[in-house]
Amino acid sequence: MYRRLLFLFVILIGWQLAALSAFREGWRRSVSGGVPADTALIDRNITLGEVVVVGRRKLIELSNDTTLINTSGLQIHRGANLEALIKKIPGMSYDRESKQLSFNGKVLNGVNINGETFMGNDIASALENLPADAVELLKLYNMLSELEKMTGVDDGAEDFVLDIKTKDSYNGSLVGSLAADHGSRGKRLDEAQANVFNAGGENLSLVGRSDNLSSMDVGRGNFQNMLMGNVVKKLGKRLTLTGSISTSTFHNETESRSYDEQYLASGTKYQGSSALTAGRNRSDFANFSLKYKIDDRTLLNISANGSRARTTGSSATTTELYEKGSAIDSLTSSTLQTSTGGRATSYYLSTDFTRRLNKAGTSISLKADANGNSDHSDNLSLSQTRYHRLAGAAGGDSLLLRHLYQLTPSHQRNSRVSLRFTQPLGKLLRLQAGYGLVYRKTANARDSYDYGAPMRPRVDSLAGESRLATRGQELTLRMDYKGRHWTVNGGVVVEWQRRSIGQRQGFRSVDSTLRAVEYKPTATAKWRKGKVSVEMRYDGYTTQPSLSALLTPVDVSNPLSVRMGNPGLKPSYRQRLDVRVEHEKYGLTLSGNYSNTFNDFAEEVSYDNATGARTYHTVNINGNRTVEGSLRWQKQLGAFLLSGDGRAFLRHDVALSNESSQSVAARSETRTVDGSVNLWCSYQPKWGYVGLTADWRLSRSHNRLTDTRVNSIDYGAGISGDVELPWGLEVRTDASCRLRRGTYATAADDQWLWNMTVAWSFLRQRQATLSCTWNDILSRRNDINRSVSAYSYHEIYRPQIRSYVLFSLKYRFNITRKQ
């Protein structure tokens, strides 16, 4: 039945797009004397720095280590934002939930406009608010800091950004929009924005928005309000000021149901939960930076940012623990209600001063930075736990009632001062040495009060304070070689630490001093010749155990999930090796990586067979490793864009579990094999857009402790299209399906989506648009996620807002400055 439905949808949408495009083409021929007016790509001369491309413009080009994306051939609807534009670029992907933007597997850390930072590198704000029509060219590259540019030495940290070159018609003009979207199920959006861009990098932006479209979770009163602004101002040729500010408020209520299977030596244990959570957050953020080129040999950089937030929340959770695959044989049942509140602040200050000592490039740099945060939270919890295997005083099930109020303030402060000396050896090689002083301090506390007893006494056994102070010295050695075909960069940072740890719980206090050494080696080698490039990269770093992992007081607010610290933890060392090969002519990218961790931090789970309660404490463990490989291909054939990618991922996870019947913890190992294939095709003529997608995802896991195997296979397909019609009319539609198959999947997990928009643009320059959108026409939206770890199998389902209609009115303006 579902295959027939899918077939009918594909035929219906394909027929609709074909009919509309035929009508559009016939009308165009009638007004142009029978000569087709559409052409996918425009012949023109393009000047890109020192690179000149003559003839038909390619979508994606490479210039040294910069990827250039020419967007003139991409067709987007009127009033589209930057997010709608990047969806039509092969290899570009954006995850709305995680706010992560990537291109061909490389994660992008920020968005620039004409070479300058926009909105403090807030990717979501840039994608949702920048008008796509203002974009002339997209550039992707590893952005060096001003200090790295001045010294000529890369510090080894990758910082890939998306840099937007705006069209000349937008530069110097005031452009913006006013929008109001309102529809059924209470969905709405009201927005106003204004932008001023300049080719030299100066920009000014102001955005205000109130909406609830970003969340599809079922809940009452969900919304987000935000106001943000950004400014870049250049005072002469030597001084650049950048600032951004934002304030936001949101409320989110979510329902969820989850299911878990925990891997134990005596067999698999099961857990089912349902929860209703609600939270409200108010946050403010400000960012400022100054770049002052005092003279040709002297540079000063200053940057600062700060934030504050206030949160309130509540939750109600019901949990059932049982030993067999049926909730009828219940081991323990519980309800937990919580009410939370908190406030948090953070700050960051950084400055560096560099002076070149001669024309060869010898330089000395002084850098200082400081950052910190504080968090004050309170939690009121009421739990009722019924143990069906334990007898109470009256002979029935044992019942535990716990009503606790907890205050948990925490503070963290970090500072660093370093001096670096850079010496060129010839024109291609530079060496750098640095020495620095480091200071870090962390303090955590918890006060617990028994609200179930008269007078609400303080519970000393659940209260305590802990602190960690680290004083260190660091030595930095780096080299940077830039040749015709080779670029080699590498170095190591060694930090000698003296760690003072203290804890007080009740009348008992403990103080100790430890000495440790941290290593952070990095090495990168790139080779490029013609259309081929090869890159190898190694990263490693030592991580000391956090204060919370070392000395967290026992937390029993949830009797079925108790957490405690482990003062015997050792530092861990993580390393990763990446290899990447690109061939521009054939559009191929081959990449792979391997990573593993020595003395990794993992939680040992102690399981009580009588109650089902779990106690977690952090331990060191070895055996966690991953291997990943991917192959990507893309090709442009006139107005057609084709791309595909395949990915394989192998993961080996290790955990420890201990049951009340065991004297030694059992080692739980889980091997997971993931694979995926994605195919993408689009046709982008002048009259619109047609896109086809298909994907296949495989995941197989095997837990050796219980010999449990979990398999899942997802199939996905989609079609989308935009058609421009006469008289300012436009039709947009998309349909997709997600078929989930495997060990736990059923047909009810499948998702079928079909959305359609009809828009009419009017006024003299079509600057106003009235549209109607029907979202999720089939009312088959689903949100279910499954995952496997060394501890357990986990799945969670969140009910979604389904079919709704949205009416929109948007007005765009472009006010050009008179010459």
Features from the language model and the residues they span:
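Sec-dependent N-terminal signal peptides
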Residues: 5-13
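Membrane-proximal, glycine/serine-rich, low-complexity loop/turn segments characteristic
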Residues: 21-50, 56-316, 336-378, 418-440, ...
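Extracytoplasmic loops and strand-loop junctions of Gram-negative outer membrane beta-barrel proteins
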Residues: 121, 175-177, 268-274, 329-337, ...
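Outer-membrane beta-barrel translocator domains and adjoining extracellular loop/strand segments
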Residues: 151-152, 217-220, 253-269, 313-330, ...
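Signature of Gram-negative outer-membrane beta-barrel scaffolds
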Residues: 404, 430-528, 537-538
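Outer membrane beta-barrel strand-and-loop segments of large Gram-negative receptors
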Residues: 416, 458-464, 474, 564, ...
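Conserved C-terminal beta-signal and adjacent last beta-strands/turns
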Residues: 676-698, 706-819
